[in-house]
Amino acid sequence: MAGRSKGMEPRLAGAGCAPAPGLDWQNDGAAFYPDAALSILPHLDALAASYPERHAGIRLHGHPALAAVLPSLTRIAGHYIGPEARPVRAILFDKSPGTNWSLGWHQDRTIVVRERREVPGFGPWGRKAGLIHVEPPFAIIERMTTLRVHIDDVPANNAPLLIAPGSHRLGRIAEPEIPAAVERLGILACLAQRGDVWAYATPILHASAASVGHAQRRVLQVDFAAQMLPGNLEWLGV
């Protein structure tokens, strides 16, 4: 694929709740927080160990370990969507030699709600892992932020997330137009080390290749929102 392609060095200046330099949130839709999750790694390890291996993505709800890891992540999300930020979905991804996959370029377009209520603009509906998913009006997705917390190192050969910087500003992108958007905007490989956190504007175009190494790649992904849903719909939360 032509266009700009580069890797973000995983050890840039800054830690905690200060993003590393090199990216502009408004223009790029991404921010990198080196070492931001170091203090919660024991809880993340316990969370990951409580689930069997060989599961591509486990949707989390009500797990006690989440209570220990969410406050610091919510503070980061609040930088981008305001003080009312709250976690609304959590997924544990676990790539390993026994469970490996690739993911084509796409935008995240669904949310998880407590129960189905017919509201104009919401649909189609579906279930994943027993949870109710629905595609909302895209303006809701545009006001969300996603954090990915790295439990393992993610060098270039361990399937880093690939993003098209700036694609979050393009609205809902029709499937046939995605390749041209990626070609035009270029690709950023989001390298990371254990304990690093990446933040993204939820609508950003992203993809991931299969891992070509033999290492495990566990990532906790949490979506955050600050707005209420219309028509008595409720976020399920985590």
Q: Across the structure, where does each feature detected by a protein language model lie?
A:
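Non-heme Fe(II) oxygenase catalytic core, chiefly the N-lobe of the double-stranded beta-helix
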Residues: 9-28, 36-194, 207, 211-215, ...
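Glycine- and charge-enriched low-complexity intrinsically disordered segments
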Residues: 237-238
